[in-house]
UniProtKB/Swiss-Prot annotation:
Optimum pH is 9.5. Ca(2+) binds at residues 181, 203, 207. Residues 1-30 form the signal peptide. InterPro entries: Pec_lyase (IPR002022), Pectin_lyas_fold (IPR012334), Pectin_lyase_fold/virulence (IPR011050), PEL (IPR045032). GO terms for cellular component: extracellular region. Catalyzes the depolymerization of both polygalacturonate and pectins of various methyl esterification degree, with an endo mode of action. Shows the highest activity on 20 to 34% methylated pectin but retains 67%, 51%, 25%, and 1% of its maximum activity on polygalacturonate and 8.5%, 55 to 70%, and 90% methylated pectin, respectively. Pathway: Glycan metabolism; pectin degradation. This is Pectate lyase B. The active site is at 305. It is an enzyme of class 4 (lyase).
Length: 391
């Protein structure tokens, strides 16, 4: 079911005309191509500027974790970071020379067989004013979460982020333990994320909080897992299937009490749970400063938060929210199965929300396509408390 409605949140949503979108990482576009120029709340952002590769004090080519640690160290003076190849950045797979600021050990993996081996790193980009991180070839960053804090005039371009999800047993499917987001923006201004691809993650994909303003996310793809034979989710479910006794929630879903097949679990686990949280703390005074633009993005089987706004302003245009496969996966759970799952306190199913605005936040979604999203725009707070109502 495709929805093209004209009354959404506080303003309007209309059918996209002439929409084009990249399906994956793309080469950096030639300068002067107006279709790819910066627009939205991050207007005027120049990142690290135009710097010659020969200026090795401010232009760093990164081939490994140690190179990246040196380039992103606070007060490094680096302005442009070019990622030259795929980087595996889990805490257990980077050398000791890289196990220092800005790298830190993230929360331990508990269930995914790969992440239990590689570990997960947290990379903090702190105090930069003018920084570009990009790849000319669409390099992939795996097993790491990046936090940009107290920074301004930052560009992140043409990168792919992958392998940061695992099955959640510890909070019974609520995914409230590991706090792994690919990118978190904190107390920053002027951040442009462009031509990137974000695969399934444990928590959010790109979150913005602590009053971060002037954010634009453009020409990017956000997607769940496709459930193929060697996909990230399939590898996780294979581990659970082989060790059911160690995973009570999974074992229950597969038991006769519920009756889901292994393939059912893979399909239902595939869609990404959350997109963009904008404002992490309810009623925080800094939330009024939040501002974000989303344009020319594909959200493929994202269940929620496109975006989820607590105060401030968000503008989304020329985006596609396509939840067709997620809707199909949800149909695998019968009402009797849902009752059985809930009776044990487990959370396993598909949410279907689009844009959410509360706490006097305003979202404008226009010139976009929404397909098979049950609640294209909603408010998840108590309407009786006017502090939680959108503008």
């Amino acid at each position: 079911m495709k929805k093209t409605v004209r009354s959404l949140c506080s303003t309007a949503l209309a059918l996209t005309l002439g929409f084009t979108l990249l399906s994956g990482p793309a080469s950096v576009q030639a300068a002067g191509n107006a279709d790819y120029n910066l627009a939205g709340f991050s207007q005027g952002n120049t990142g690290g500027g135009i710097i010659s590769e020969s200026n090795t004090s401010t232009y760093k080519k990164v081939y490994n974790a140690t190179d990246l640690a040196l380039a992103l160290k606070k007060n490094s003076g680096v302005k442009v970071v070019e990622i030259m190849n795929d980087l595996d950045l889990g805490w257990n797979e980077i050398p000791s020379a890289a196990q220092t600021s800005p790298f830190a050990k993230h929360n331990d993996a508990l269930t995914h067989p790969v992440l239990k081996q590689t570990g997960v790193s947290k990379i903090t980009v702190d105090g930069f004013n003018g920084l570009t991180i990009f790849s000319a070839n669409g390099s992939k960053i795996k097993h790491a979460a990046i936090t940009v804090k107290r920074s301004s005039n930052v560009i992140i371009r043409n990168l792919e982020f992958d392998e940061l999800w695992e099955w959640d047993e510890s909070t019974k499917g609520d995914y409230d333990k590991n706090d792994w987001d690919y990118i978190t923006l904190e107390d920053s201004s002027g951040v442009w994320i462009d031509h990137c691809t974000f695969n399934k993650a444990y928590d959010g994909l790109v979150d913005s909080k602590k009053g971060t303003s002037g954010v634009t996310i453009s020409w990017s793809t956000f997607k769940g897992d496709d459930g193929s034979a060697n996909s990230w989710v399939t590898r996780q479910i294979n581990e659970l299937e082989a060790n059911k006794a160690s995973y009570p929630m999974y074992n229950y879903l597969r038991s006769s009490a519920v009756g889901l097949s292994k393939q059912d679990v893979i399909a239902i686990s595939g869609p990404q749970k959350k997109g963009h949280l904008v404002g992490a703390t309810s009623l925080e005074s800094a939330n009024a400063n939040l501002s974000i633009t989303l344009h020319h993005n594909l959200y493929k089987d994202i269940q929620d938060r496109m975006p989820r706004l607590r105060g401030g302003n968000a503008h989304a245009y020329n985006i596609i929210m396509d939840a067709a496969d997620a809707r199909s996966a949800q149909s695998r759970i019968t009402s009797a199965m849902a009752t059985a799952i809930a009776s044990k306190g487990y959370k396993f199913g598909i949410t279907s929300n689009g844009a959410i605005s509360t706490e006097s936040g305003a979202v404008l979604v226009e010139k976009s396509v929404i397909k098979d999203v049950q609640x294209p725009c909603t408010q998840q707070s108590d309407r009786s408390d006017q502090r939680h109502v959108h503008r």
